[in-house]
């Protein structure tokens, strides 16, 4: 029997200004869906897997074909509904409604666990959408580079006087998200040793210039790190190995990194984490024929790695969970103090979220890198005093290789996003850009996710698990006229541990787009300021007042 999720075809997004659909509002999701499965973008495109273990763009290849065919014929007063990667309906709405509404991996809370999801997945009744995989706005490892860079820079400020020169970071995982870590570390001025069990992933990062070198030898990796740090160079190396083996070995040897974190796909104990002592081939085979054995062995191995991270923490080394739920897995395996070290958001990033600043991104549907160069320049023009952002854009231009359609990640917040969107739309209208731009973001944004072990960890008022906020975010983006809106469960940290929403809006150069952009790109980050103001953060309360937000129960206006 053939596998409906496997096909050897190669998918790439169309380029240029010629439409394959009836309008740019349907051409945009068509191109971004296809871009998610570009072999230069996706981790395992032949299996529809974009990143993050089994984060897929469509449920089956037949569903992919149906989505493509539907988008090509969708009218400007119709909306396509996608249920866990399957196109289930087309309904008449209106021209300012989203052209696509997506719900992925959502389960009633009592059944929101991997066992139940995997049972549904095996029957072909569900699809894991991760965050930007099933919502068609993944842009490769660049999508998390700036957030990781901001994290490392802030860690440097807090622990090392703002200077990471001569310092090094230990981490694990070089998948679609973790692959950003070596480059982010180097951009922040540090060296990086990244442990990866799957050599093909390390090779992918070498090919796209996200990591500088590769080795199979721990001794060689440490020697290079030592030489680079002594010389004040910022370089990175991928070590082929198992983090659950390497981290404890480093503790045993008394090796002391300057920062420790991890971005293995520990959120998925079957498909995301190689058990100690197993080969990758054995692991892949047993995922299909004995998933329970894989999960048991993987969880035990995670406990070993987290114990090593605790050992680093107890030795005074800054150590953070980078949002993959590995501490939770270790806790469930009996490691009672697994949460002794913090997550990266409460440790370093939350003040940005309080001002609605987060992973704003855009992609050039033309496929021409020059369109991104022009938008980079426009960002600098409109935000002339943000030298930190200018520095980021300069580094990104020099260091980041585009994957698939040219794109840019750029952390900006409430008060700036709508200005950039309107400027980009004007550039499309006057012909400065060769084709429309789409603007989206990661689901891990200021007001669009509830994830108690990641983004909403240790909220000031204890509201970590309240998931009304991403639901309201999705509803508001729908009402505001985003081009497509998504609502997912389980991204980043796995089943039962998160709910989150995404939006993408197309700058097609029209005046209608101006109105939609102004609404969406104001309201979307404003929900994040609202959420943090409601939790009692002074930065958010001050920013809400400065931006004139009307928050009756929070500001009394």
Swiss-Prot record:
One of its GO terms (biological process) is L-histidine catabolic process to glutamate and formamide. Binds 1 NAD(+) per subunit. It is an enzyme of class 4 (lyase). Keywords: Cytoplasm, Histidine metabolism, Lyase, NAD. Its EC number is 4.2.1.49. The active site is at residue 410. This is Urocanate hydratase. It comes from Brucella melitensis biotype 2 (strain ATCC 23457). The lineage of its organism: Bacteria, Pseudomonadati, Pseudomonadota, Alphaproteobacteria, Hyphomicrobiales. The gene is hutU.
């Amino acid at each position: 029997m053939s596998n409906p999720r496997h096909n050897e075809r190669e998918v790439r997004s169309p380029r240029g200004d010629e439409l394959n659909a009836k309008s740019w509002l349907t051409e945009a999701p068509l191109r971004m869906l296809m871009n998610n499965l570009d072999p230069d973008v996706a981790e395992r495109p032949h299996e529809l897997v974009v990143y993050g273990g089994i984060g897929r763009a469509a449920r089956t290849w037949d569903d992919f074909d149906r989505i493509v065919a539907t988008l090509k014929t969708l009218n400007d007063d119709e909306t396509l509904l996608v249920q866990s990667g399957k196109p289930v309906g087309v309904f008449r709405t209106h021209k300012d409604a989203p052209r696509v509404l997506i719900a992925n991996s959502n389960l009633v809370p009592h059944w929101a666990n991997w066992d139940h999801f995997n049972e549904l997945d095996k029957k072909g009744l569900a699809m894991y959408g991760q965050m930007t995989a099933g919502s068609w706005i993944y842009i490769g490892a660049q999508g998390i580079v700036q957030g990781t860079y901001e994290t490392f820079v802030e860690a440097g400020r807090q622990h090392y006087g703002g200077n990471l020169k001569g310092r090094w970071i230990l981490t694990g995982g070089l998948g679609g998200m973790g692959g950003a870590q070596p480059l982010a570390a180097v951009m922040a001025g540090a060296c990086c040793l990244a442990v990866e069990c799957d050599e093909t992933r390390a090779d992918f990062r070498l090919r796209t210039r996200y990591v500088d070198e590769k080795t199979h030898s721990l001794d060689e990796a440490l020697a290079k790190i030592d030489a680079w740090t002594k010389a004040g160079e910022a370089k990175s190396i991928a070590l082929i190995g198992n983090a659950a083996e390497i981290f404890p070995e480093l503790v045993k040897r008394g090796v002391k990194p300057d920062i420790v974190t991890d971005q293995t796909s520990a959120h998925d104990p079957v498909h995301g984490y190689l058990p100690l002592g197993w080969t990758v081939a054995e692991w892949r085979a047993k995922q299909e024929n004995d998933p329970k054995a894989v999960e048991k062995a993987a969880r035990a191995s995670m406990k070993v790695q987290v114990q090593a991270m605790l050992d680093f923490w107890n030795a005074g080394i800054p150590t953070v969970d980078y949002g993959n739920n590995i501490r939770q897995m270790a806790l469930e395996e009996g490691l009672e103090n697994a949460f002794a070290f913090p997550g990266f958001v409460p440790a370093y990033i939350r003040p940005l979220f309080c001002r609605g600043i987060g992973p704003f991104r855009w992609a050039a549907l033309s496929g021409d890198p020059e369109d991104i160069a022009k938008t980079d320049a426009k960002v600098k023009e409109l935000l002339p005093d943000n030298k930190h952002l200018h520095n980021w854009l300069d580094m990104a231009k020099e260091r980041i290789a585009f994957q698939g359609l040219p794109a840019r990640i750029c952390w900006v917040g409430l008060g700036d996003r709508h200005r950039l969107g309107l400027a980009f739309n004007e550039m499309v209208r006057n012909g400065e850009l060769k084709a429309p731009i789409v603007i989206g973001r990661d689901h891990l944004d200021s007001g669009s996710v509830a994830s108690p072990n990641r983004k909403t960890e240790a909220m000031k008022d204890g509201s970590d698990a309240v998931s009304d906020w991403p639901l309201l975010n999705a509803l508001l983006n729908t009402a505001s006229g985003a081009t497509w809106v998504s609502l997912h469960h389980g991204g980043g940290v796995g089943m039962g541990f998160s709910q989150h929403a995404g939006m993408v809006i197309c700058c097609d150069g029209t005046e209608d787009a101006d109105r939609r952009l102004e609404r969406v790109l104001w309201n979307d980050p404003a929900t994040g300021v609202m959420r943090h103001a409601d939790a009692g953060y002074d930065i958010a309360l001050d920013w809400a007042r400065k931006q004139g937000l009307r928050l009756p129960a929070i500001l009394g206006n």
